[in-house]
Amino acid sequence: MDLFEYEGRTYFITVDYYSRWVEIKLLTTQTAKSVITAAKELFSTHGIPDIVISDNGPCFSALLFKEFAAKYGILHTTSSPRYPRANGEVERAVRTVKGLLKKNDDPYLALLSYKLVSHQVSYSWEEDSELSSLSLQRHWHPET
């Protein structure tokens, strides 16, 4: 987890270390409360992680954030201020996203193009399925 600024806007970014999936949310403030709200939205979609790594920023070192992590059963680890590479996945994602934002006027289109291109899966599960993609999309399964 990290926060970064681009053109006067503050973004909350998270990276799943296993899949390298990136999630970004625009924040109105850099408070622990706004970070917790963004994290809760993320967790409601992807589940609660076992471990969260962040820097020692004020929003992550605040008592409110520590209480949130404890309540949700999250081990919160911080990277060393002198060694930010300890949170390298997020730092690399920040550089990538900033580069995309520079190339596109609409930040949402930039982020969408990043997700569509960089996270395509080459394996097609439909090839192994006897059901059509339409029946799978509609959650309808024929009787056997």
Enumerate the predicted regions with their spans.
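Retroviral integrase
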Residues: 1-97, 120-144
